[in-house]
Amino acid sequence: MGLTPDSLFKNINTFGLLFESLVIRDLRIYCDTINARLYKYRDSKNREADAVIQFEDGDWALVEVKMGGQKDIDAASLKLLEIAKDIDEEKTGKQSFLLVVTKGNLAYRRKDGVYVIPLGCLKN
């Protein structure tokens, strides 16, 4: 690809795609260790989440990946909450958690219950 740090900072869209790919790769590895499955999510309203984790017991978690700041984290959290409220847990299993993975350095749980975790904090 011929990418350098300078070229990535000049093309934030490509940088974002690579970051998302790295997060998905790491989530897939973690899912493999706990016998969970990782999928892309799109519903009948055409809403998407970057990933859905389905655990062995049928419970699930929705994940969004964001490189931006607080505005992007807020928007991603709202999106996850809106999607989750429309999922029929009688058919799918129960919601385990909602997660936004970021580039930051602080992990926390928001007042709305959504977890925000930097990629660097995801460890096996």
What are the functions of these language-model segments?
Residues 1-124:
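A cross-kingdom feature that marks ATP-driven nucleic-acid transaction machinery
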